[in-house]
């Protein structure tokens, strides 16, 4: 029995060695890679938000890694962001800025997908759930990414973008007419209070 177990262990070691030598990429996910991906995600938010202050990340964690090729992969990350005391046009590194204090300081929990190729960040997509700055307990979601379209101001801090082409399609007009004639089920006297995801592209 012991000899059989040793034989199986030896076969397992040889098998893993074979796959490593057969060209399958082996990645070492050190903390610096995670910091770089989080930094790129925060930079995407800061580049497309309308807040006069920079946001800084806190409590980041790696959720998933997808190998795309021999030298490329994507990382799914979850992290929090909070507004800092540094002005957006100050040129400061958000990681060196102090967080603003106060109960109503803008903050959010975000999930991002960062594509890395040849050890360089190639693409970043971020989705954040923002806590409301009002006295209500409502929240809203925003999507930050590089999608072509025109911008429309959505609130004091963030921009939600809707491609112009979708507004010119007959299907879009028919959908609006259907919504006017047949409101969604539930209490028809009050608007829908569920937060909606918004797409942010950064193009004016």
UniProtKB/Swiss-Prot annotation:
<feature type="modified residue" description="Phosphoserine">
    <location>
        <position position="166"/>
    </location>
</feature>
<protein>
    <recommendedName>
        <fullName>Secreted phosphoprotein 24</fullName>
    </recommendedName>
</protein>
<keyword id="KW-0964">Secreted</keyword>
<dbReference type="InterPro" id="IPR046350">
    <property type="entry name" value="Cystatin_sf"/>
</dbReference>
<dbReference type="GO" id="GO:0005576">
    <property type="term" value="C:extracellular region"/>
</dbReference>
<keyword id="KW-0597">Phosphoprotein</keyword>
<feature type="modified residue" description="Phosphoserine">
    <location>
        <position position="90"/>
    </location>
</feature>
<feature type="modified residue" description="Phosphoserine">
    <location>
        <position position="175"/>
    </location>
</feature>
<comment type="similarity">
    <text>Belongs to the SPP2 family.</text>
</comment>
<dbReference type="Pfam" id="PF07448">
    <property type="entry name" value="Spp-24"/>
</dbReference>
<feature type="modified residue" description="Phosphoserine">
    <location>
        <position position="139"/>
    </location>
</feature>
<feature type="region of interest" description="Disordered">
    <location>
        <begin position="179"/>
        <end position="204"/>
    </location>
</feature>
<keyword id="KW-1015">Disulfide bond</keyword>
<dbReference type="InterPro" id="IPR010892">
    <property type="entry name" value="Spp-24"/>
</dbReference>
<feature type="modified residue" description="Phosphoserine">
    <location>
        <position position="138"/>
    </location>
</feature>
<dbReference type="GO" id="GO:0046849">
    <property type="term" value="P:bone remodeling"/>
</dbReference>
<keyword id="KW-0732">Signal</keyword>
<feature type="disulfide bond">
    <location>
        <begin position="86"/>
        <end position="97"/>
    </location>
</feature>
<comment type="function">
    <text>Could coordinate an aspect of bone turnover.</text>
</comment>
<feature type="signal peptide">
    <location>
        <begin position="1"/>
        <end position="23"/>
    </location>
</feature>
<feature type="disulfide bond">
    <location>
        <begin position="110"/>
        <end position="128"/>
    </location>
</feature>
């Amino acid at each position: 029995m012991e000899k059989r177990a040793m034989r199986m262990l030896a076969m397992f070691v040889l098998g893993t060695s074979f796959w490593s030598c057969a060209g399958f990429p082996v990645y070492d996910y050190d903390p610096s890679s995670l910091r770089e991906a989080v930094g790129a995600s925060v930079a995407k938010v800061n580049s497309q938000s309308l807040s006069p202050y920079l946001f800084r990340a806190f409590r980041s964690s790696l959720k998933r890694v997808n190998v795309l090729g021999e030298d490329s992969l994507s990382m799914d990350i979850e992290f929090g962001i909070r507004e800092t005391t540094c002005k957006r046009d100050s040129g400061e590194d958000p990681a060196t800025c102090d967080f603003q204090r106060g109960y109503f300081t803008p903050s959010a929990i975000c999930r991002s997908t960062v594509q890395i190729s040849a050890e360089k960040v190639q693409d970043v997509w971020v989705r954040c759930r923002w806590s409301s700055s009002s006295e209500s307990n409502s929240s809203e979601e925003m999507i930050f990414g590089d999608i072509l379209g025109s911008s429309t101001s959505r609130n004091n801090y963030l921009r939600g973008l809707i491609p112009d082409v979708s507004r010119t399609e007959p299907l879009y007009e028919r959908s609006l007419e259907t919504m006017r004639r047949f409101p969604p089920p539930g209490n028809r006297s009050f608007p829908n209070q569920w937060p909606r995801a918004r797409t942010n592209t950064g193009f004016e």
